[in-house]
Amino acid sequence: MKMKSRKYFWESLWEGILKLSGSVTSIAIILIIIFLFSEGFSLFSSKKIEDGYSILVNKNNKIEDVSSSEIKKVFDMEIVSWKELGVDNNEDEITVFRIDNIETYATEEEMILIEEDVANVGKVISRILEDNSGMIAQVPKDMINKDFTQKEIDLGHFSIREFFTLKEWFPTALPVPQLGVMPIIMGTLWVSLGAILLALPFGLAASIYMAELSNSKVYRFMKPIIELLSGIPSVVYGFFGLIVIVPMIQKIFNLPVGESGLAGSIVLAIMALPTIITISEDALRSVPRAMKEASLALGANKWQTILKVSIPYSISGITAAVVLGIGRAIGETMAVLMVTGNAAVMPKTLLEPLRTIPATIAAELGEAPAGGAHYQALFVLGGILFIMTLLINLFVEYISSKNKYKTK
């Protein structure tokens, strides 16, 4: 009786420990997801203008609606007249004013007033804007006081539409960060698609050979090598790509630089091969022997049996292997960062440098001020990556469940 009660006690204890650890893990994952999306969504309630600054114009200026990209072009002197911004009744050219060059526009008396009391800056800036009807100014918000009589432009908040449709990623731009993630999303999809197109034929061929054609000696040699490939750190693949693949691409295609989307796709294809080969091989080995023998008995040869029986029967498992390979490619960071050129521009071909979501987060998160628009935008990118990988995993679960139902 004592033995039974003791055994029951230890079983209950271990069961409780397992339940507790599972609960803690689940709660931690949920909290991480909540933190990720709460930090990300806070971007869309943030002002576009850099924190602590204001954009000012003459009080008679009719400008009302201006985008963040237009403001950047104004301060970069790419837009030089108010007509280009839709202010039809304003013939003035745009003059850019920053607080650093206040001495250029202020009189000696005004500079003395500022030196005596910094609170006089608002009055001086008002006078400068009054005398220069075409001026646009970026000044610290705390300099706008009761003496300021001109107009402040309200740029509004970051919008979801602009975030996903703009094609410029320049989060450190002043006075307004440029947070268009379209180039980064497209770079991620291009590299991942290229990787799967390269990895699928080689991975499927290797899995067919190992499952259907190889003898036991060759199989015992190949299996550990493939498993070893999956255990190599991604930075090692990155070094291999940087030393071997990048110079090769530069030489073959006569490019100014070899860091490109194609280099990233080749490296990711090599990294995805172990996943595709292993899962596809397991799926091919699950084909009932009776089906193969029936095919051979009807006069089909070995290759006809593989193409007409084995592959169609195991297509769900092969599809799951491909999708998991895509998931590996989408989430990879270091290897891609090393070989793609890390350029946040819209890719036109795989021979151009580009940037992916994981590489962007890894390269910029350490430099982004906590709580700023740049920091929050990186969390939005993390949320996008999470949703992409979640959808991939759900699709794999769906395919796997279909395969299990079919085998029953």
Where are these regions (language model features)?
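Interhelical loop and adjacent transmembrane-helix boundary motif
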Residues: 337-386
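C-terminal transmembrane helix and the adjacent membrane-cytosol boundary/short C-terminal tail
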Residues: 281, 285, 289, 296, ...
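Transmembrane alpha-helices
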Residues: 279, 288, 302-338
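Periplasmic/extracellular loop-to-transmembrane helix junction in inner-membrane transport proteins
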Residues: 2-16, 41-51, 67-70, 78-81, ...
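Flexible loop/hinge segments at secondary-structure junctions
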Residues: 47-165
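Membrane-interfacial helix termini and adjacent extracytoplasmic/periplasmic loops
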Residues: 11, 39-44, 159-179, 237-271, ...
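Cytoplasmic-entry segments and transmembrane alpha-helices of multi-pass inner-membrane transporters
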Residues: 14-16, 202-241, 408
